């Protein structure tokens, strides 16, 4: 059986581990995109430290959970969003205005929707978290 979307699988695993009260989640296979999404989540205070562990295959991310995540997931399909259209997707994926964040892939790298809006850039929606 092949893995169709490693990012969606990783975020679903984090959400499930968080909901049952685990302190650590192991995400495999590891990828650069998953690492960058974890970096944004760490910068925003949703997860603790995370580290990459080489296992001879695709690698594993060990993520320390701190109990801040209610729900997280990947956005499929990855919608293209202009910098003034974020509010429409906030209403669709987030429970309330100003609560949670959308992670966006922009020409300037991965960032939250608030950072993208203030930088004046659009991009593709990658995931949501609250």
UniProtKB/Swiss-Prot annotation:
GO MF terms, alphabetically ordered: rRNA binding; structural constituent of ribosome
Superkingdom per UniProt: Archaea
Keywords from the UniProt entry: Ribonucleoprotein, Ribosomal protein, RNA-binding, rRNA-binding
GO annotations of cellular component type: ribonucleoprotein complex; ribosome
InterPro entries per the UniProt record, alphabetical: Ribosomal_uS8 (IPR000630), Ribosomal_uS8_CS (IPR047863), Ribosomal_uS8_sf (IPR035987)
PROSITE patterns according to UniProt: RIBOSOMAL_S8
Gene Ontology BP terms: translation
Family membership noted in the UniProt record: Belongs to the universal ribosomal protein uS8 family.
Physiological role: One of the primary rRNA binding proteins, it binds directly to 16S rRNA central domain where it helps coordinate assembly of the platform of the 30S subunit.
Assembly and oligomerization: Part of the 30S ribosomal subunit.
Protein name: Small ribosomal subunit protein uS8
Organism: Methanococcus maripaludis (strain C6 / ATCC BAA-1332)
């Amino acid at each position: 059986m092949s893995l169709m979307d490693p990012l969606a699988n990783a975020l679903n695993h984090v959400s499930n581990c968080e909901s049952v009260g685990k302190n650590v989640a192991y995400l495999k296979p590891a990828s650069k995109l998953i690492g960058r999404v974890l970096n944004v989540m760490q910068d925003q205070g949703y997860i603790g430290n995370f580290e990459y562990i080489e296992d001879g295959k695709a690698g594993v991310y060990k993520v320390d959970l701190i109990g801040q995540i209610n729900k997280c997931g990947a956005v499929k399909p990855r919608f293209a969003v202009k910098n003034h259209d974020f509010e429409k997707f906030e209403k669709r994926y987030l429970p309330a205005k100003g609560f949670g964040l959308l992670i966006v892939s922009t020409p300037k790298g991965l960032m939250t929707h608030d950072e993208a809006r203030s930088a004046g850039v659009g991009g593709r929606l990658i995931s949501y978290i609250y």
